[in-house]
From Swiss-Prot:
Membrane association type: Single-pass membrane protein
PFTB repeat segments: 147-188, 512-557, 589-629, 638-689
GO CC, any one term: membrane
TM helices/strands, residue ranges: 118-138
Function: Specifically mediates the conversion of oxidosqualene ((3S)-2,3-epoxy-2,3-dihydrosqualene) to parkeol.
GO molecular function: intramolecular transferase activity
Record protein name field: Parkeol synthase
Subcellular location: Membrane
Amino acid sequence: MWRLKVSEGGSPWLRSVNNLLGRQVWEFDPDLGTPEERADVEKARREFAEHRFERKHSSDLLMRMQFAKENCQKLDLLAVKRGEHEDVMGEAVWSSLKRAISRVCNLQAHDGHWPGDYAGLMFFLPGLIITLHVSGVLNTVLSSEHQKEMRRYIYNHQNEDGGWGLHIEGHSTMLGSSLNYVALRLLGEGPNGGDGCIENGRNWILDHGGATFTTSWGKFWLSVLGVFDWSGNNPVPPELLLLPYQLPFHPGRMSSYIRMVFIPMSYIYGKRFVGPVTPVVLELRSELYNDPYDEIDWNKARTQCAKEDMYYPRSSKLDMFWSFLHKFIEPVLLRWPGRKLREKALATSMRNVHYEDECTRYICFGGVPKALNILACWIEDPSSEAFKCHIARVYDYLWIAEDGMKMQIYDGSQVWDAGLTVEALVATDLVKELGPTLKRAHSFLKNSQLLDNCPRDFNRWYRHISKGGWTFTTADDGWQVSDCTATALKACLLLSRISPEIVGEPLEIDAQYDAVNCLMSLMNDNGGFSAFELVRSNTWLEHINPTEAFGRVMIEYPYVECTSSSIQCLALFKKLHPGHRKEEVENCISKGANFIESSQRSDGSWYGSWGICFTYATWFAVTGLVSAGRTLGNSATVRKACDFLLSKQLPSGGWGESYLSCHDEVYTNLKGNRPHGTHTAWAMIALIDAGQAERDPVPLHRAAKALLNLQLEDGEFPQQEIVGVFLQTAMISYSQYRNIFPIMALTGYRRRVLLAGNI
C-alpha cells in the first residue's frame, strides 16, 4: 500500500531552509495494510474507473483512508450546543458545521498543514516521463509501482473519444493526446495495450492530422524524445537573455512563469538535444503520423496546430516573424562565428537555471519548469550534483489518489490551504475546542515564512524581494506570492487575537512588518497587486504569445484576487497596528479598492484569473471592497456585484459555474444547472459580507439549504467539478476547497443571518 509521509526526507541531496516542513511524499510499502484496508483501496479504484466519464475528479480517498487510521482521535463537538435563539434551521446549520469541522481537523497533517491533490493538468506528467526516459533514470527514479499508478492515471483520464485533454475535464487535444500516448508507451505499454485504449488514442491522433498538429510545447517534448525533428519547431533563442533589459521583450520583463519555462527550454533548444533513439522511439515515429517519418515536411509542421488546441491563434505577421528567425537567424547562430554567440547565450541560460535551482532548493517554479530544469542540468553534466539534487525533489510533485499517480502543478498548496483553513476555523465559535488544530497550523505558518531575499544580487536574476513573504507551497520553494503572503499573514493576525495558551505565541512583530513590506512592494501604480512580481512590460507582448494553448501568459498582470487578499490583510493589520506606516498602508488599501472598482465588468462581475471564474473573482472583489469600507448601502459597485450574483442563483438555491467561463469569458452554468458546493459558498460569503441579509435574506436561506443538502454523511462536502485555473485554459484541482469554503459560508450565515435575527 501507499503511505503519505509529511515533512520527512532522508536523501543527502535534499536541500531545505526549515527541515523540509510541509514536504509531502508518497512511498510504497508492500507490507503495509490489512487485507480489509487493501480491499477498500481496490474498491475505491474500481469505483472511480467505472464512473470516470461522469466523475472526472478523485475524492483523494487514499489519503483520507490513511488519516482516518492515523488521526483516529475524534474531535467531539456534539456537546457544543446551538445558540439560545436558534430555530430548527439554526440547529441544522450548527450540526452541519460541527460535522464538517470535525472532519477537517482529522484531515490535518501532524506538521500543521492540510495535504491534498493539487493536479488536474494532463501535460505535466508526460514531460517528466520524457525527461527521466532520455536521461536514462526512468526505472531508477520510478519504481514499478510508481509506473503502474501513472499508467492507471493516464488511462482513467482518457476521454471517451480516445484522446486526452489539456486537463482532466477538457475536450481532447493534440497536446494532451500525443504526450499521454507517448507517456504510456515509455511506461511499458505496447502499441496494442490497455484493452484497446492505446489503439483508441493512436486513432484519435491520426484522425486529427497526426502529431505534427500538436502545440509548440508538444513539439518541443516530442523533439527531445526524438520523435519530432527540431526543424519543425519555432525558434526558442537563448540569445534573448543577452539583449538589453530595457527592451520590453527581454525575458526578465516577461511573466515569471513564462520566463522560468523559456530559460531552460531555450537551453535545450539551443543544444538541439535529442535523447537516445531506442526501439520504442523508432516505433513511435511510425505510430504518431499519417506520413512516413522521413517524408514529413517539418517546415510546414512548424506552423501546424489542431483547432482543438488553438486558444490563442497566431497572426500571419507572427508566423512571418518565426519564419524569419527559423530560416535566416538560426542558421547563422549554428555556425561559426555566430556559434560563439550561441555558446555565450547557452552559458547565460544555465547560470539562470542554477540560480533558480538554488533559490527553490531544486523544487522549481512548477511542474513544467521542474522537468525542464532537470533535463537542462543533465544535458550540461549527467553526473552533476545539480542533477542529483533535482532527482531527490521529483517525488515532491507526485500525488496518488484512487485515480492513480499524477504530477501536481506545484509541490502542493500547503501555505495557501493552511491560511484559508485557519480563517475558516477562527470564524467559528469553537476556538477553544479547536485549539490543538489551530496551534499546529499557526506553527506551520510561522515557520513557513521566508526569512531572506534570494541570495546575492537577486535583481540581476530578475527576482523580486521575498523577505517576509510566504509562498504558495513551502518555504523551500522560495517564490513569494502576494495573495499567499496576505492570506498567511491574515491568518497569523487573526490568531494573534486569541490567547497564546490556546493557539501559541503570535508571529513576531518584526516578521509581521517584513510581511507587510513584501506585500506592499507588489502593488503596481494602478493600485492592482500582481502575484509574483510587478508588471514589467506591455500587454502588446501577448501578440507574440508562442504557446497557442494559453492566454494572458507573456507578462505579469495585476489581479483582482491578489488585490482583494492584500487589502483585506492590510485592513486587519491597520486595525491591530494603526501606527505602522500608516499613510502607506492606507494608500495601498485605497488604491487597491479603486483598482477593483475600475476592473468591474458591465454586468457587475469580475473575471477570475486563479479560480472559476466570475463567481470566484466577484467573491474576492466584494470581500475586498467591504474591507475597504464599501457595502451594499454606500457602493453602487457592490450593489451591482450582488445583483450579478443573485442573477446567477440556480432554482436549487446554489451556484455552479463551468470552467468554460474561463475559456470563453462568458458566465456558463455547469451541465444540467447543477449546484456546486464551492461556488455556492463563494457567492454566499460575498453576499453576506456585502449586507444582503439586511436587504433580503431569502436568497441566503435558499443557498444555505443547498449547501446542507450537498453535505455527505461523514461531514465532508463532495468533490465536484474543477475550481482552479491559470493562464485562462489550464484548469487545476484544489481538493481542500470542498470543505474550507462551505464552512466559511455556513459560519457567516449562522452568525450574521440567523443569530443576527435576519430571518
